[in-house]
Amino acid sequence: MLAFLYLAILVTTCGKPENELHLYIWADYIKPELIERFEKEYQCHVVYDAFDTNESMYAKLKLGATGYDVIFPSGYTYELMLQQNMLDQIQVEALPNLKNLDPKYLPDVQEQGQFIYAVPFAISYSGVAYRKDKTQVNERSWSIFGRTDLKGRMTMLNDIREALGAALKYLGYSANTLNKSEINQAADQLIEWKKNLAKFESEQNKHGIASAEYIVVQGYNGDMLQVMRENANVDFFIPKEGSIISIDYAVIPKYAQNTKLAHAFINFLLNAGVAAENMQFTQFSSPNKAAFALLPESMQNNPALFPPQEILDKSDVIKYLGKEGDLYNQAWDRVKKS
């Protein structure tokens, strides 16, 4: 693994042409045809690497990878990167399409109205996907992972905040709690659920649920809606106890070599038509308010894509917790060792 990371770092620290844009993104995150359109409009070449968790992305950057122009971390990782002075300023005047964003998503990233450090790009809600042809679900709850009849046929995300967050929501706690007792209770709950899991994993849950290798998986709504588009036997729900919400941001790292093209790409993604087209590809919702009106009604009215207010009221956006967040690392270590 380390050898792979060092090789990746070697590759991404090499020099590159001025008309090349390097992205570090989630898999299946931007419609390929949109990237081709950008390349044609700006006479450039886009190169991208994919990551599967915020933790792996952050670890690679901390090991010294310095070849990226735009990165797409989730909120709590963005906050960590900002605190560690890893991000460059994004100039507001270079983003005329910023007006398309819902203003409620901007206060956390705004600085004096002149520049920002991040642009809200996508919103994901974690929940549960299951095979309708293999099992019945009578209660749309995180408690499904306690079902012994599905032992060995379920997975949960290999992600500290998502897995522990699911247990915290099930117990009625905040996914951002710093109460040691509550976090330990969540770890105990997760250890109980672990007895029924095939494993914790974040890379193969889409394929696993599509092939029926797994009958129930914890996953992100967009990923699971992509599977449902191709497989009518798969369904997805956001549990009644609430979801763990991640807001992904476009950021420009301090070392970016092509900031002009990086700004152009972010502004391109903020175009209402582009954002709507990408939403239809990824099935992840967007803070782009102007794009919502361009979506088909089937997407506008899909509760898995745009959850009802009663679910949102019970859900939590994952926050960076600073050093106190080590309580989660300790709890996760206990779960993994159990």
Where are these regions (language model features)?
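A ligand-binding cleft/hinge motif common to bilobed small-molecule-binding domains
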Residues: 77-80, 210, 215-233
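Periplasmic-binding protein-like
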Residues: 124, 183-192, 230-254
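A bilobed periplasmic-binding-protein/Venus flytrap-type ligand-binding module shared by bacterial periplasmic
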Residues: 127-134, 169-170, 246-261, 266, ...
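Mature extracytoplasmic/periplasmic domains
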Residues: 253-312
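Extracellular/periplasmic bilobal clamshell ligand-binding domains
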Residues: 295-338
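Ligand-binding "clamshell"
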Residues: 82-90, 112-116, 226-238, 300-302
